[in-house]
């Protein structure tokens, strides 16, 4: 990742509401690949070596500050508040106090541009330095540039000014080269020129773009054309979905180049920060969320959803398994249709089969719960077998209670273990048992009613019913009413 060798500060503009999102949430908090929009430009600036990075917040300022601080705890962040949203120049001025005493270039970028690469930021920073220009700015060429400020160049082909669409003439609207909202400018020049920006425009706002003609007279402007896919902002849900697809596609490509098989990248979904080991296989429609780590040679089946899960090497996750905040050791087999809830810890070569739910429980090496079981707040020893339909009754209405099952124990199908309870190593629990007391190691426990079999009972019952029907006959007519006539 490129890092500038010279001092560099950055300002990320993240104060807007984003009315086109039609949302109660600030625009920059909407997520792409599991991260807020503003996370990406901030992270790219940090990767480039910018310090400090000043984030200008406004709408839902506290929420934006909290989200970015949590997502980038090591970043050299500072926050500045734009109390009123009076335009982009006004937003940049809000960062002046946070950069007090700083001398050097300042990179200015928008908080709604998640697809920018650090290499693109470096190109804008270095263009100013190479050209010895007052300002460098990024431009992009669009087939349909509606809504963007048009770049007007001088006779020598250098950017001379940027005209916002509402202020543009018909000829200027025909220009397809537009402002990408990414600038690099010397701090001293920035504050000096922004003090002169006015509101003589259709929006009656302080435009940062007014800096361009001032800079053109003060030392020139260097233009850098960048890919439109990278620099385009996110303004509505459609653009959000597109940005998400592009970002996930980049992640998928990086994984595949590192030796991961993603069977259908178009049906792969993951968050920034997910890790996948070499020779892992990811089947279609898998969703990998949060800080999930998938080990080498692990296979994740169709439709699996893993959130903050840690899977060791050689794990098999069969289709439609759901994992949240759980650990799975090497060689374990999960699913299909199993669920690991927070605190589940599945040991090496253990099996958690179809319709088994595990919560805050540990399965030892080779332990098996192959179908239709609930294991909560349990410690299950190595090699233990949990029969179909087994339930650990961990909740008594007030607290969660533990169940301990020893190594090699065998729990018969449809058993109910009422916690707190301990089943000793090698013990057997007969199928259909309801247990409330400890079972010693090597013992057999039966907690069910004794079976009673009555031979010939069905025939006897049918005979009794037949005799009753013969003896009863038709019901007598009620007094005062004529007997009902039979149909002839």
Swiss-Prot record:
Region (N-acetyltransferase): 259-488
Comp. bias intervals (Basic residues): 478-488
Main location per the UniProt record: cytoplasm
Binding site for Mg(2+): 112, 235
GO biological process: cell morphogenesis; cell wall organization; lipid A biosynthetic process; peptidoglycan biosynthetic process; regulation of cell shape; UDP-N-acetylglucosamine biosynthetic process
Swiss-Prot/TrEMBL cofactor(s): Mg(2+)
GO cellular component: cytoplasm; membrane
Active site: 371
Region (Disordered): 459-488
Residue numbers spanned by region Pyrophosphorylase: 1-237
Keywords: Acyltransferase, Cell shape, Cell wall biogenesis/degradation, Cytoplasm, Magnesium, Metal-binding, Multifunctional enzyme, Nucleotidyltransferase, Peptidoglycan synthesis, Repeat, Transferase
Catalysed reaction equations from the record: alpha-D-glucosamine 1-phosphate + acetyl-CoA = N-acetyl-alpha-D-glucosamine 1-phosphate + CoA + H(+); N-acetyl-alpha-D-glucosamine 1-phosphate + UTP + H(+) = UDP-N-acetyl-alpha-D-glucosamine + diphosphate
Gene Ontology molecular function terms on file: glucosamine-1-phosphate N-acetyltransferase activity; magnesium ion binding; UDP-N-acetylglucosamine diphosphorylase activity
InterPro entries in the record: Bifunctional_GlmU, GlmU-like, GlmU_C_LbH, Hexapep, Hexapep_transf_CS, MobA-like_NTP_Trfase, Nucleotide-diphossugar_trans, Trimer_LpxA-like_sf
Disulphide-bonded residues: none
UniProt subcellular location: Cytoplasm
Annotated residues for binding of acetyl-CoA: 388, 394-395, 413, 431, 448
Ligand binding (UDP-N-acetyl-alpha-D-glucosamine): 13-16, 27, 82, 87-88, 110-112, 149, 164, 179, 235, 341, 359, 374, 385
Entry's family note: In the N-terminal section; belongs to the N-acetylglucosamine-1-phosphate uridyltransferase family.
Function (record text): Catalyzes the last two sequential reactions in the de novo biosynthetic pathway for UDP-N-acetylglucosamine (UDP-GlcNAc). The C-terminal domain catalyzes the transfer of acetyl group from acetyl coenzyme A to glucosamine-1-phosphate (GlcN-1-P) to produce N-acetylglucosamine-1-phosphate (GlcNAc-1-P), which is converted into UDP-GlcNAc by the transfer of uridine 5-monophosphate (from uridine 5-triphosphate), a reaction catalyzed by the N-terminal domain.
Entry-linked NCBIfam families: glmU
Protein name per the record: Bifunctional protein GlmU
Organism: Anaeromyxobacter dehalogenans (strain 2CP-C)
């Amino acid at each position: 990742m490129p890092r500038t060798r010279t001092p560099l500060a950055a300002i990320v503009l993240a104060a807007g509401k984003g009315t086109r999102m039609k949302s109660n949430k600030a625009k920059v908090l909407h997520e792409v690949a599991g991260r807020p929009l503003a996370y990406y430009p901030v992270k790219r600036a940090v990767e480039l070596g910018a310090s400090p990075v000043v984030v200008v917040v406004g709408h839902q300022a506290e929420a934006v500050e909290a989200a970015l601080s949590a997502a980038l705890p090591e970043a050299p962040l500072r926050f500045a508040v734009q109390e009123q949203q009076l335009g982009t120049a006004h937003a940049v001025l809000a960062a002046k106090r946070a950069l007090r005493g700083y001398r050097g270039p300042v990179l200015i970028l928008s908080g709604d541009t998640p697809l920018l690469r650090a290499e693109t930021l470096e190109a804008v920073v270095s263009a100013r330095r190479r050209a010895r220009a007052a300002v460098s700015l990024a431009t992009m060429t669009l087939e349909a540039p509606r809504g963007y400020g048009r770049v007007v160049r001088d006779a020598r082909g250098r950017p001379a000014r940027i005209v916002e669409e509402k202020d543009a003439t018909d000829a200027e609207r025909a220009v397809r080269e537009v402002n990408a909202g990414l600038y690099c400018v010397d701090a001293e020049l920035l504050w000096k020129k922004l003090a002169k920006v006015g509101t003589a425009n259709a929006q009656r706002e302080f435009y940062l773009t007014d800096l361009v003609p001032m800079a053109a007279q003060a030392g020139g402007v260097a233009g850098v054309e960048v890919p439109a896919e990278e620099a385009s902002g996110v303004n509505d849900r459609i653009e959000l979905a597109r940005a998400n697809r592009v970002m996930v596609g980049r992640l998928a490509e990086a994984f595949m180049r590192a030796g991961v098989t993603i069977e259908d990248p178009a049906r792969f979904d993951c968050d920034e920060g997910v890790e996948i080991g070499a020779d892992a296989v990811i089947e279609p429609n898998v969703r990998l969320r949060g800080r999930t780590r998938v080990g080498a040679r692990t296979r994740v089946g169709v439709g699996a959803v893993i959130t903050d899960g840690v899977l060791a090497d050689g794990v098999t996750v069969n289709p439609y398994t759901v994992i949240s905040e759980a650990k799975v050791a090497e060689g374990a087999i999960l699913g299909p249709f199993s669920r690991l809830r927070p605190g589940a810890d599945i040991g090496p070569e253990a099996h958690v089969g179809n319709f088994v739910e595990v919560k805050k429980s540990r399965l030892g090496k080779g332990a098996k719960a192959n179908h239709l079981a609930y294991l909560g707040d349990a410690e299950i020893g190595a090699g233990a077998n949990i029969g179909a339909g087994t339930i650990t009754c961990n909740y008594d209405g007030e607290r969660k209670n533990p169940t301990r099952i020893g190594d090699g124990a065998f729990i018969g199908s449809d058993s109910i273990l009422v916690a707190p309870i301990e089943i000793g190593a090698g013990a057997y629990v007969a199928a259909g048992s309801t247990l409330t007391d400890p079972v010693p190691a090597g013992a057999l426990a039966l907690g069910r009613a004794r079976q009673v079999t009555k031979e010939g009972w069905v025939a006897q019952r049918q005979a009794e019913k037949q005799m009753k029907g013969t003896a009863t006959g038709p019901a007598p007519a009620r007094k005062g009413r004529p007997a009902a006539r039979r149909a002839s």
